[in-house]
Amino acid sequence: MNERLQFVVVTGMSGAGKTVAMQSFEDLGFFCVDNMPPALLPKFWELIKENGKISKVALVVDLRSRGFYDQILGLLTGEEEQHNIKTDVVFLDATDEELVARYKETRRAHPLAMDGRVADGVRKERELLSPIKSEAQIVIDTTNMTPRELRSDIFGHFSTNKTIPKFHIEVVSFGYKYGSPIDADIIMDVRFLPNPYYVTELKNKIGTDPAVYDYVMNQPATEEFYTDYLKLLMDIMPGYQKEGKSNLTIAIGCTGGQHRSVAIAERLAKDLSKKYVTNISHRDAHKRKETVNRS
């Protein structure tokens, strides 16, 4: 391996936030594996070395088996003598009361008390994991944390300027006659704007055509709407970022997805790209299905 390998073992109490932690490491560019069977560890390690391009690995594991923990650290300790490796153990914890409350909320059984009280399972697990917690380089108490705060804590420990994920915006135009995008976070209906479809010379063109674009954007209704809508989006983007969202899809819809939505999406993507990483796509712009009615 040419560059230093960062290997993070994420473990801790059940219900303390290992799933959120794994998602956070994924956003930081780590190659993540959740609950790998111990028998596969040596083979996994060989594949990492052979690949040569993976520099960050996060292994999220259930370490109630002390033997697995010893196996992981034994393997890494031996490899550290031959390769440039940095190893960290992150232990996620919370108070017994908080863990019990989380299990009660999800109505799940504790893995160490499948037929008994959750509190008994938490107590048993804490006893088993106590030695591992004492050896962890990083212990995070998630008792009073929201998922966003846990994510922020992990970023604080492991992010660099190169690994902080950028906020990506996807602007997509669509036609309501084909259904709205299922992955849209924000949908704006622009069917209230004058429709170029009814202008003979514009009917068979799409919103990327300068003539159609100018027709849509130069309407008085468009100017007033667009100014307010862009300001609204710029005002709320920081909130999405603070909540830990790294990707946002904004969908702009009109009837057929060929004229108004395309033009507005083009302008919006251009303006948003001045501050954010922005991509644009026109889902239905080239669909030419005949329709009797167009509103």
UniProtKB/Swiss-Prot annotation:
List the keywords (alphabetical): ATP-binding, GTP-binding, Nucleotide-binding
The record's listing under Pfam families reads:
PapZ_C, RapZ-like_N
Its source organism is Pediococcus pentosaceus (strain ATCC 25745 / CCUG 21536 / LMG 10740 / 183-1w)
Primary role:
Displays ATPase and GTPase activities.
The UniProt GO MF terms for this protein read:
ATP binding; GTP binding
Q: What are the binding positions for ATP in this chain?
A: G12, M13, S14, G15, A16, G17, K18, T19
In which family does this protein belong, per the annotation?
Answer: Belongs to the RapZ-like family.
Q: Has the keyword tRNA processing been applied to this entry?
A: no
In which residues is GTP bound? D62, L63, R64, S65
Coiled coil residues, start to end? none
PANTHER family, per this entry? RNASE ADAPTER PROTEIN RAPZ
State the protein's name: Nucleotide-binding protein PEPE_0450
InterPro entries, A to Z: P-loop_NTPase, RapZ-like, RapZ-like_N, RapZ_C
